[in-house]
């Protein structure tokens, strides 16, 4: 019962004496004297297995756990976990079950009836349902009643789960949906699931190669946040080959599938390891975009990001041709991560020219890259003249002449500059590089120059190493 001792108010004189048998009995007596209402607030914060164990403390405690609004079961390798969950749900007497979390590991027997557990939760107006099936059984479908649960607010389905929405569905309260490494019966099941959620705000997807979908379509008018990760290819490619994979020229017809996003209310978009063709439409309210390893973007894809205020962009060779054509009229914060095979200096200057309100650009090229070319722009980007306040460069080495010229240009023309944060490559001559940076003229005399070897930046309250 130590988990309860940790949160109980203990008298000062008790906290300074050894835990003798008498002292422990006094503490247990105080715990048992707590009112039921307080116990029902405490027990949801401990594992259900521990909460059930409290029933042996006293007659008062025997039935307390039966009224808990939240049950959480995580398989720790026990073959009896299925029996324990089944009996717990049978004995649980609360009229409503707000939250049910179940995680079954690879050693769990495959004959447990998870469908009945889901049915039990749905029948008791569950609000938060989270199932992770890591067992060796084939993907398991859930009862149809799950997809017509009008109280469900958060739904998380992970791993060996078959999303089968064959009949009309209705999830009028669903706000958060997470689909992680699941399998879909067909494209229609996904479409019906999303279209049945009229107030859905947040969608998180981790897809894999064998999910049985040709096209992943996200058409949700209410959606505000989308996190889509397709990392199956990365697992098959060595780290030193990723850059080459990103920049291989591939025809759209050769791709395995496609990602289609049509969500006009979207404010946050995170795309990572998206190896399929990506089509984005109707995103005029997009505020933040995190684009990492999207190898085949076209101009239409990048143009769909033009309304963002915060942009993280892993910059690939296929993006070079689009830089001069797209205006980022509202961009304030820009994290620019060019891969090693790209001559990126001039594309970056185009992006600066097309981002008149940019305040905080960050360059991250923490690697040795190919030879870069530099041509001084014919006109100074507007953001340098009137908006740019903080300039960051992670992985500055100072050895390449082109990089020195870019750094000199930024410092010499950024009139509103307040802070320059430089993280140096460990391979460079630290003393010489610091001296060189300090000697570069700055038009903003009040600006601070901060130089370190630490590799930590914060973007829109997120930390990136």
Curated annotation (Swiss-Prot):
UniProt entry tagged with the keyword Cell division: no
Pfam families per the UniProt record, alphabetical: F-box, FBD, LRR_At5g56370
FBD domain span: 373-424
LRR repeats: 154-181, 182-207, 210-230, 248-273, 339-365
SUPFAM superfamilies in the cross-refs: F-box domain
Domain F-box: 28-74
Highest taxon listed in the record's lineage: Eukaryota
Keywords: Leucine-rich repeat, Repeat
InterPro entries the record matches: F-box-like_dom_sf (IPR036047), F-box_AtFBL13-like (IPR053781), F-box_dom (IPR001810), FBD (IPR006566), FBL13/AtMIF1-like (IPR050232), LRR_FXL15/At3g58940/PEG3-like (IPR055411)
Signal peptide region: none
PANTHER family per record: EMB|CAB62440.1-RELATED, F-BOX/RNI SUPERFAMILY PROTEIN-RELATED
Protein name, UniProt field: Putative F-box/FBD/LRR-repeat protein At1g22000
Organism name: Arabidopsis thaliana
């Amino acid at each position: 019962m130590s988990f309860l001792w940790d949160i109980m108010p203990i008298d000062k004189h008790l906290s300074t004496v050894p835990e003798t048998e008498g002292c422990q009995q006094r503490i247990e007596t105080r715990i048992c004297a707590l009112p039921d209402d307080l116990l029902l607030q405490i027990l949801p914060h401990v594992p259900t297995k521990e909460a059930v164990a409290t029933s042996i403390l006293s007659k008062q405690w025997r039935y307390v756990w039966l009224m808990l609004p939240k049950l959480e079961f995580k398989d720790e390798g026990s073959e009896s976990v299925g029996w324990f969950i089944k009996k717990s749900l049978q004995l649980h007497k609360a009229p409503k079950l707000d939250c049910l979390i179940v995680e079954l590991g690879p050693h769990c027997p495959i004959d447990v009836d998870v469908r009945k557990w889901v049915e039990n939760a749905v029948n008791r107006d569950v609000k938060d349902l989270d199932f992770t099936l890591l067992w060796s059984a084939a993907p398991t479908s859930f009862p149809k009643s799950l997809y017509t649960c009008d109280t469900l607010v958060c739904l998380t389905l992970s791993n060996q789960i078959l999303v089968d929405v064959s009949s009309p569905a209705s999830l009028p309260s669903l706000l958060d949906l997470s689909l992680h490494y699941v399998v879909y019966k067909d494209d229609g099941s996904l479409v019906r699931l999303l279209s049945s959620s009229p107030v859905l705000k947040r969608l998180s997807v981790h897809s894999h190669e064998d999910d049985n979908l040709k096209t992943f379509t996200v058409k949700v008018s209410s959606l505000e946040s989308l996190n889509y990760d397709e990392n199956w290819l990365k697992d098959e490619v060595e780290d030193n080959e990723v850059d080459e994979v990103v920049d291989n020229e591939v025809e759209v017809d050769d791709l395995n599938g496609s990602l289609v996003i049509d969500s006009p209310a979207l404010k946050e978009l995170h795309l990572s390891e998206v190896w399929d063709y990506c089509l984005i439409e109707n995103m005029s309210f997009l505020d933040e975009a995190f684009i990492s390893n999207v190898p085949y973007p076209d101009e239409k894809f990048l143009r769909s990001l033009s309304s963002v205020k915060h942009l993280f962009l892993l910059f690939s060779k296929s993006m070079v041709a689009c830089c001069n054509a797209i205006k980022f009229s509202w961009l304030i914060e820009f994290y620019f991560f060019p891969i090693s095979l790209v001559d990126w200096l001039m594309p970056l200057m185009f992006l600066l020219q097309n981002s008149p309100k940019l305040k905080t650009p960050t360059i991250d090229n923490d690697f040795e890259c190919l030879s870069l070319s530099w041509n001084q722009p014919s006109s100074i980007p507007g953001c340098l003249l009137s908006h740019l306040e903080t300039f960051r460069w992670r992985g500055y080495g100072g050895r390449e002449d082109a990089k020195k010229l870019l750094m000199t240009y930024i410092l010499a023309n950024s009139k509103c500059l307040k802070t320059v944060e430089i993280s140096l490559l460990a391979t460079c001559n630290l003393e010489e590089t610091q001296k060189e940076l300090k000697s570069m003229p700055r038009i903003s005399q009040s600006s601070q120059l901060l130089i370190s070897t630490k590799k930590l930046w914060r973007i829109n309250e997120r930390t990136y190493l």
